């Protein structure tokens, strides 16, 4: 067992206690952040005259060697060590001798792990944002090519009004655009350096915390040492943002699953993103979309778990906070994997434009426009609503759409109707008349696409 403590103890740690307490099995993914943080720390110590330049160079050379050897696989991280910090320090001492024992001067594992976590999450926020960009690019590509691809819009999973595929995809662009903005917001707020906070009360050494923060790319040091070591707000915010991403992906998945069904046939998922059945030869299942929908719960669980962990912890650091890693790591890996797969599925998906347009022609998606026709001819909307409701009932009885109802039948219910009612309720007219900002008409949708393209150029 390699530990960084033990001088005041008279007994060896019980093996079960050691295993229960150890975190090396999961915090080893911090190895790069831990080493980079240590390099910045010793650089600052040398600048402040706490270490000599020779000691600094010796330690940094040793740390770089550990980093290179771990990356190449030459050096393995094992459960011989309690955590990633003890792994790095023990290996450093083995390589450079007594100079390595000075690495931890002016530092506690409390501010060290707080730094490691911030560096790691900062990297993950950027990686997540890159994957969000890929989603946005995939969605925008579909929008550009489908400004006049008509389809039904739904409320309560029932056909409601005609829209376009571009309009439907634009809703998801807006969702993931907000996810991108959340990533920027999280990064800006979390970008302060906790190193130098010590265990909770700083240190007596003349550290230059601003210099360390600058070396590591932070905007500055944290301004309260107790908060510096015990803050996990940024991680909770990140998990909340990941939960939002997964919620958006889950809703998108539900649409894809429905559209892919034989009852809808709006899309065909590429073979590379589908699976079959072990017993039913005809099956082509939307498993990626279903798994994304299913995995959303585990990301929510990570957020809820950390909130529950943190809610009762007094200041400052407590061992409970070791539980800020395993579930969040899983949530990060899950969300990134789902984003990557979903973008690939979208890019290779075939949209059945004719099928979508045919579906939009049925289900009385033009009923609102029939009511608007009456309003434009002086009928109060509430009366127009009732008149069209009667027309729908008549068409249901005759098993025909409004477009096929003879004019004399229209006139029996309201004499206001004339021959131009058919043009007014045509699919193209229904969509094109909706030309205000954010509506599905070609003009507002082209404006949206142009705006989104500019947004992506500045991403």
Question: What are the roles of these predicted feature ranges?
Answer:
Residues 1-202, 207-213, 275-276, 287, ...:
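A helix-coil-helix interface module used to build multimeric assemblies
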Residues 54-55, 152, 222, 383, ...:
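A generic structural-conservation signal
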Residues 43-51, 164-167, 236-244, 369-378:
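Short, well-ordered beta-strand elements within core beta-sheets of diverse protein domains
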Residues 38, 85, 89, 235-238, ...:
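Short runs of predominantly hydrophobic/aromatic residues within well-ordered alpha helices
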Residues 41, 62, 66-69, 91, ...:
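Generic, well-ordered alpha-helical scaffold segments in large soluble proteins
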Residues 50-51, 75, 264-265, 380, ...:
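Conserved hydrophobic residue
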């Amino acid at each position: 067992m390699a530990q960084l403590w033990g001088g005041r103890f008279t007994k060896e740690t019980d093996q079960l206690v050691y295993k229960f307490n150890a975190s090396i099995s999961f915090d080893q993914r911090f190895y790069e952040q831990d080493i980079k943080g240590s390099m910045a720390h010793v650089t600052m110590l040398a600048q402040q005259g706490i270490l000599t330049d020779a000691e600094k160079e010796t330690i940094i050379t040793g740390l770089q060697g550990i980093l290179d050897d771990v990356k190449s696989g030459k050096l393995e991280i094992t459960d011989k060590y309690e955590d990633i910090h003890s792994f790095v320090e023990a290996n450093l001492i083995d390589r450079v001798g007594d100079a390595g024992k000075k690495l931890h001067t002016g530092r506690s594992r409390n501010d060290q792990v707080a730094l490691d976590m911030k560096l790691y999450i900062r990297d993950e926020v950027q990686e997540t944002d890159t994957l969000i960009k890929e989603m946005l690019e995939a969605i925008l590509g579909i929008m550009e090519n489908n400004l006049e691809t008509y389809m039904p819009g739904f409320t309560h999973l029932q056909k409601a009004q005609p829209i376009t595929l571009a309009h439907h995809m634009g809703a998801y662009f807006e969702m993931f655009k907000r996810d991108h903005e959340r990533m920027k917001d999280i990064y800006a707020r979390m970008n302060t350096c906790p190193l130098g906070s010590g265990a909770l009360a700083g240190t007596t050494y003349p550290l230059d915390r601003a210099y360390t923060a600058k070396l590591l790319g932070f905007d500055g040091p944290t301004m309260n040492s107790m908060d510096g070591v015990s803050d996990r707000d940024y991680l909770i915010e990140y998990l909340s943002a990941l939960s939002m991403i997964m919620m958006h992906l889950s809703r998108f998945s539900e649409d894809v699953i429905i559209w892919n069904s034989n009852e809808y046939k709006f899309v065909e998922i590429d073979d590379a993103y589908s699976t079959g059945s072990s017993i039913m030869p005809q099956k082509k299942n939307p498993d990626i979309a279903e798994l994304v929908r299913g995995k959303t719960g585990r990301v929510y669980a990570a957020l809820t778990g950390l909130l529950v962990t943190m809610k009762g912890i007094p200041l400052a650091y407590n061992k409970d906070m070791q539980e800020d890693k395993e579930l969040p790591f899983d949530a990060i890996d899950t969300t990134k994997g789902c984003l990557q797969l979903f973008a690939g599925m979208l890019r290779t998906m075939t949209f059945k434009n004719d099928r979508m347009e045919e579906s939009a022609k049925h289900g009385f998606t033009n009923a609102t426009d029939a009511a608007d026709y009456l309003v434009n001819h002086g009928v109060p909307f509430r009366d127009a609503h009732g008149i069209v409701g009667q027309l729908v009932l008549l068409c249901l009885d005759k098993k025909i759409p409004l477009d096929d109802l003879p004019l004399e039948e229209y006139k029996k219910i309201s004499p206001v109707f004339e021959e131009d009612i058919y043009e007014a309720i045509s699919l193209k007219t229904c969509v094109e008349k909706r030309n205000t900002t954010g509506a599905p008409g070609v003009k507002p949708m082209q404006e949206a696409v142009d705006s989104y393209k500019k947004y992506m150029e500045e991403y």
